[in-house]
Amino acid sequence: VNHAAPGSAFNHTAVTHTGFVKSGWAHTGLVKSGLVKSGLVKTALVKAAVTKTVVAKAAVTFLAATTAVGSNPVLNLGLFVGFVAVTLYIVHRVSSGNQTTSSYYAAGGEFTGGQNGIALSGDFLSAASFLGIAGGIAVHGYDGFVYSVGWVVAWLVGLLLVGEMLRNTGRFTMGDVVAFRMRQRPVRVAAAASTLLISYFYLLAQIAGAGGLVALLLNITGKFGQSIAIAVAGAIMILYVLIGGMKGTTWVQIIKATLLLMCMALITIFLLGRFGFNFSTILSQATQHNSLGNAILTPGTLYGKNELDFVSLALALVLGICSLPHVLMRFYTVPNARQVRRSLVWAIWSMVGFYLCTLVVGYSATALVGSDAIVHAPGGENSAAPLLAYAIGGSILLGLVSAVAFATILAVVAGLTLTASVSFAHDVYASIIKKGNAEPRSEVRVARLTAVIMGVLAILGGILVNGRNVAFLVALALALAASANLSTLLYSLFWKRFNTPGALASIYSGLGSCILLITFSPVVSGASTSIFPTVDFHVFPLSNPGIVSIPLSFLCGWVATMIGSREENPAKQVEMEVRAMTGIGSGLHS
């Protein structure tokens, strides 16, 4: 292990004497999947979304760093228990009377644009953002900041194309919009299948990561103990959803996002003060303590190896985020389209501020810790933020950052579980099984039961994939959302002729092509960071299928619409256009 930067608060001795460098943890697929030991193709999937790989690597990083500097697991446990206790109390207080579908599914549309915007940003200002982006900047400089740009730009799709019209046209789910003027049964089944599949892939990765984070922070090394940690994390998630519904889940996300933003802002201010509030001084010292030297201030240190895969990833990232079911559902928690605009503006500005702070944190980590120490520490470049936290605040700050990371994961998994349960209860049970005649209380009961089932399945799946590289799950969820959902929504909202065959074709072609291409890609086999690294049956050369599956979904939707029979319903078409543009007649919370 190389020495840290001269004069830094963290040196190589602490790392080498922890034993983690020589342990099996340092050689798992989780660590090997880092940017340092893989190319753009493998890395992009890991950093493009909140993935189990990033979270698990973050957990390894936290444990190694806290062990190295003598952090107390009891402190971490106390912070975890404290956060869970406080948030459960708040969820219970704000969620009384969650017996109607409007209240349980959409919080009665009672949140303001500002509150909803903070909750929206909380879905993405995650442990991966904090650790991954800060670490990428610390090691690679300018190129490490590119993902931040992609995440912010992605929200413009929601602001300009989807948000307002979706809120005005639907009530609770994407299925409401797509099935508005089409045959209800097949379209709602397709929409529910898409939502459940995307949510489960996302949820599986997150719940495994949450359990892994808790297990590693508390120094639980046995498989049985780690399984218990995953089960506990899943149980907490289920409690949030059962007790709180959308209102309670939203408050958890608001609290988590606020903590994360405050934590990042305070660290940034402290770092700027340490360098005389002169960012140039930070950059100058960073170049001296990074093996790349001045190159970290210019593009080209990381990207350019596989342009086509990067374009494919960019498409999935920019077009997928605002097509994710749990994001779409959040547009219904505000009273009108104006508040949707405000929500997205708040979310965008929150993320802009956060990612600007990562510039200071990332370059400061290089300046104070040194890129060599970061790269060779357990967890690779994801160790930048924990090592920096100890350098400036000791074990207490490390514990706080750990608690915030855990809060981040819980907020995300609660939102995903709620989305999946609502989609089944509203689109399948109420609209298809009960043919629109379900009692609100019975529909909410079905939603709660579905949440428990989804939670149990996620726990079991998380235990099964514990310790494996499942980065492809979230990458697949993002590509699925961009392929299956975006094309269907845009056609439904903007193309009068779009019909039931077109909707089914766009959804199922997006789902099928994504799963097929990812199965036969380097993500699953044929590479050292693959799910099955010892075999090679990949035939698709790219790690992200977005560049193929997204256009294919649009094409299939168009072809099926053109060859299918016209579904003339002028009255429904006019009603949909008026509602989409004005919100008149939406009756969302009636």
Please report, for each region that a protein language model flagged, where it lies by residue.
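Membrane-embedded helix-loop-helix hairpins and adjacent transmembrane boundary segments
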Residues: 2, 60-590
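Short, strongly hydrophobic alpha-helical membrane anchors
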Residues: 1-71
